[in-house]
Structure formats: structure tokens, C-alpha cells
Amino acid sequence: MAPFIPGELLPEPGEIELNAGRPVTSLHVANSGDRPVQVGSHFHFAEANAALQFDRTAARGQRLDIPAGTAIRFEPGDSRDVNLIPFAGDRRVIGFNGQINGPLDA
């Protein structure tokens, strides 16, 4: 057996579906600002940059449905549809823009 390499991933053969079975919310997002805005995979989307125009109430408690460690970049004037999925686990949101700083379901 070959030695393991630290950090090496050994996925099973075939397709891997990310976030399988999770409920998805689709929102239309537009960057009304004059600078690009990038939002990471695990950022609480409702607290994203104020230049992004979208339904923040619908985005509460959710993050982008994209692979971990990746991001979506919105160029000035850019608009697109994004898919969001709910945070799981303890559903506590701490930090980001400080709008929640506690449990989402309280």
C-alpha cells in the first residue's frame, strides 16, 4: 500500500453530489455597486455586501450552494441567479457583519 500524503483526498469512483437532499432557495442577485463583490461558500448570505440587491429575508440562515472554499464574484452591474442552502449543525451565526451573533432559530 502506498504511503498517505498529508491532506490527500481519496474519493470513491463516480459522481459526488454536493449537499444532496438539502432544500434549495433560488434568488436573483444584482451588484448595484461600482466595485466587484465576492461571497464565499460559507458566508451568511443575508449579511453580504450592501451593494448586492436581493431578498435578504429569504436569505436569512443560508449560504451559497457551492463547493467549500470557493466563492462567487459579482462584477459591478452584474446580476445572476444563485442557489442557497440552509446552515446546518447548531445553526449559530457568529461574526460576519454582526447582524445575528447567535442562534438563527431563536
UniProtKB/Swiss-Prot annotation:
pH-related activity note: Optimum pH is 8.6.
Coiled-coil residue spans: none
GO cellular component terms, A-Z: urease complex
Primary localization class, coarse: cytoplasm
Catalytic activity, reaction form: urea + 2 H2O + H(+) = hydrogencarbonate + 2 NH4(+)
Pathway info: Nitrogen metabolism; urea degradation; CO(2) and NH(3) from urea (urease route): step 1/1
S-S bridge residues: none
Compartment(s): Cytoplasm
Statement: the UniProt record of this protein carries the keyword Hydrolase: yes
Temperature section of the record: Optimum temperature is 45 degrees Celsius.
Biological process (GO), any one: urea catabolic process
InterPro entries cross-referenced by the UniProt entry: Urease_beta-like, Urease_betasu_sf, Urease_subunit
GO molecular function: urease activity
Record-linked SUPFAM superfamilies: Urease, beta-subunit (SSF51278)
Enzyme Commission number(s) of this protein: 3.5.1.5
Keywords annotated in UniProt: Cytoplasm, Hydrolase
The UniProt record lists the keyword Hydrolase: yes
Subunit structure: Heterotrimer of UreA (gamma), UreB (beta) and UreC (alpha) subunits. Three heterotrimers associate to form the active enzyme.
Family (UniProt): Belongs to the urease beta subunit family.
Protein name: Urease subunit beta
Native source species: Synechococcus sp. (strain WH7805)
Lineage start: Bacteria, Bacillati, Cyanobacteriota, Cyanophyceae, Synechococcales
